[in-house]
Amino acid sequence: MNKYVKESIFKVLMVISVFIVIAYLVMIVGINVVKGGIVLIKNPAVVVTAPGPKYLLGGEGGILHAILGSILMVVPSTCISCAASYLIALFLQVDYIKNKLSNKLRVVFDVLWGIPSIIYGIFILNILIITNRRGSLGAGIITLALLQMPVIVRYMDEALNSVPNGIRESAYSLGATRLETAIAATKYALPGIIAGILMGMGRAMGDAASVIFTSGAGNSMPKGLSKSAASLPVLIFQQANSFYPSVREHAYAASFVLIFI
């Protein structure tokens, strides 16, 4: 076969593949945005209304409890994970640890990144069972912090590794301490660090499997770290197949909110 014909065939296949991926993405996002948008246009109060007493039976109420639950779980867990991940990423640099050991630790975090999120949930669930505790907002925060950590660590590590050695060498030649050198490197690596934080936060915000066992799934507003708390992904999972059309509408509204968050 002529090499130009081969090249043309591969170009066509690449274009078709790209089109299929884009069409699939548009369909997934489009269906949820359209259906969720229709629900919000008909009843915009659904996002600022707490669920009523007969919420799961098609009664009055909205998804405010799940929105607040997601925010109260994701924001603290991201803060905890960022602080721990930054220290770990700094430790992985050649200034603090030998290259062979740092490479082994990177493999560990790569493996942790690939572990299904439900495994994190089961791990925390076992701890709750051993300590005779129920699912709660606090347990959800810990679960999501662990879930985000491998993602944020690897992004921060790669961002810090991309800092030119000249910056570190210049800092040391001027008498800077390791801490001062790390701060200088962090400023240079800030875009990559922020990207890692956003990736970790996005993974936590959209994950249902890890918190379905640990945070509980009540229909009440969050009341404390030791109390159960709903979240948007879990609400979607539970209500998307409901017999009541009004309950299914809550799931579409939650999908719309989750996409734009």
Feature names for model-found ranges:
Residues 2-8, 12, 32-79, 238-248:
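Periplasmic/extracellular loop-to-transmembrane helix junction in inner-membrane transport proteins
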Residues 7, 97-103, 163-164, 168-195:
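Amphipathic cytosolic juxtamembrane alpha-helices at the membrane-cytosol interface
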Residues 26-30, 83-90, 122, 135, ...:
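Membrane-embedded alpha-helices of multi-pass transport/permease systems
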Residues 65-73, 77, 109-116, 161, ...:
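Alpha-helical transmembrane segments of multi-pass membrane proteins
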Residues 76-109, 122:
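Transmembrane-helix boundary motif in ABC transporter permease subunits
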Residues 85, 116, 174-175:
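Glycine/proline-centered hinge or cleavage motifs at structural transition points of membrane proteins
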Residues 110-145:
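Generic hydrophobic transmembrane alpha-helix motif, especially the helices
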Residues 211-259:
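Interhelical loop and adjacent transmembrane-helix boundary motif
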